[in-house]
């Protein structure tokens, strides 16, 4: 099917689920910074009206200021509203020691769990991401810039959704644009200009006279963030990856140290696919990796592209270390302390992170 419309969505850093992701990853950052390669972190976060709960399992987690880290992250995101203010949060810390049974298989850098992970890349744009998810992210990044640059009636919680028309398998135009953004009371009629500015600045000629716009279609979005909807870590896994354009193995990234292959192997799969496309071996590439808990080598590797799949797979198998330790060492994942900053607007794309670097 070469002619079709495909839709993807993104959410802002103030979306409740993303607030949870950022808190979980801020604790991962702190644990890794204060620990070493024996540090293990698996932390989930729940946020709701004036309330944050963190729970999970850790090892060699030398962090004694958990509540301060949470408040600082919420303040950084920008929440100072009555129902969710960084200074008035009730915070419950239920973090405890990791099971010794898990450590038996992972202390020697076996995979931290079983699972399947996918990576994808395409030559549709410089970010090497499918256009619908790429532009969904870019719209919200631009909207945040505007919010911080004078449009102070805009508030942190926002969502976007972009429908791209493909003709002959190539990006043709934007068919539908949906943007919902939280705002201060009384400013519901002031949104159209900044939203359209944000969209037009990133999408350019893809917007035409036939593009349909939906800007705050419910009419009012004052109560937002965790005060409007409960947020949980790991509920935006499609936003985090490829917007549904490629499969997802089901495992979330945030709140997990690099021995968890849900995170590290997904980063590797993306890096592999991106380098295949960057080397002009294919216009698009999809990689699947699978692992078993405590086992170092992947249990399977699968390559799908419009190139020579067997040649690509053979090269990967013979030249790339796909063990958890090999992945961790290649990308320096135990010395990367910016997981919290990287978990918004997708984990992939035009980002200065090790798994987005070009070069074998």
What annotation goes with each model-predicted range?
Residues 39-43, 158-164, 211-216, 282-292:
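A short glycine-rich, hydrophobically flanked beta-strand micro-motif that places a catalytic Asp/Glu
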Residues 40-61, 293-297:
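Short, charge-patterned binding micro-sites
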Residues 48, 284-360:
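Internal helix-turn-beta structural module
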Residues 7-10, 49-51, 68, 72-80, ...:
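Glycine-rich, mobile lid/loop segments that gate access to catalytic sites or pores
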Residues 186-277:
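Glycine-rich anion/phosphate-binding loop at the beta-strand->alpha-helix junction
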Residues 1-40:
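N-terminal, positively charged regions that mediate nucleic acid binding
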Residues 2, 48-49, 122-123, 242-248:
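Short connector loops/turns at beta-strand edges and beta->alpha or beta->beta junctions
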């Amino acid at each position: 099917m070469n002619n079709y419309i495909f839709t993807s969505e993104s959410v802002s850093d103030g979306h409740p689920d993303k607030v949870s992701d950022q808190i979980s990853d801020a604790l991962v950052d702190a644990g890794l910074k204060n620990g070493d390669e024996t540090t293990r972190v698996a932390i989930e976060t729940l946020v709701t009206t004036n309330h944050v709960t963190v729970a999970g399992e850790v090892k060699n987690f030398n962090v004694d200021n958990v509540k301060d880290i949470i408040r600082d992250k919420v303040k950084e995101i920008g929440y100072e509203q009555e129902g969710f203010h960084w200074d008035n949060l009730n915070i419950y810390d239920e973090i405890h020691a990791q099971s010794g049974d898990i450590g038996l298989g992972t202390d020697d850098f076996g995979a931290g769990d079983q699972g399947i992970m996918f990576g994808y890349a395409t030559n549709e744009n410089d970010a090497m991401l499918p256009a619908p998810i790429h532009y969904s992210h870019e719209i919200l990044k631009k909207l945040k810039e505007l919010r911080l640059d004078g449009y102070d009636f805009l508030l942190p919680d926002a969502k976007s959704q972009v429908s791209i028309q493909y003709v002959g398998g190539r990006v043709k135009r934007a068919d539908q644009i949906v943007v919902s953004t939280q705002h201060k009371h009384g400013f519901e009629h002031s949104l159209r200009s900044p939203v359209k500015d944000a969209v037009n600045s990133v999408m350019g000629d893809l917007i035409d006279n036939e593009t349909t716009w939906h800007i705050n279609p419910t009419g009012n979005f004052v109560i937002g963030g965790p005060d409007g909807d409960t947020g949980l870590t790991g509920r935006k896994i499609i936003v985090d990856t490829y917007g549904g354009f490629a499969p997802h193995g089901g495992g979330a990234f945030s709140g997990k140290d690099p021995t968890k292959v849900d995170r590290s192997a997904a980063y590797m799969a993306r890096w592999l696919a991106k380098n295949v496309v960057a080397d002009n071996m294919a216009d698009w590439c999809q990689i699947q990796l699978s692992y078993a808990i405590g086992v170092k080598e992947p249990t399977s590797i699968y390559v799908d592209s419009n190139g020579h799949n067997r040649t690509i797979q053979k090269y990967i198998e013979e030249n790339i270390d796909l063990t958890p330790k090999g992945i961790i060492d290649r990308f320096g994942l135990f010395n990367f302390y910016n997981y919290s900053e990287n978990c918004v607007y997708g984990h992939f794309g035009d980002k200065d992170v090790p798994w987005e670097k070009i070069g074998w």
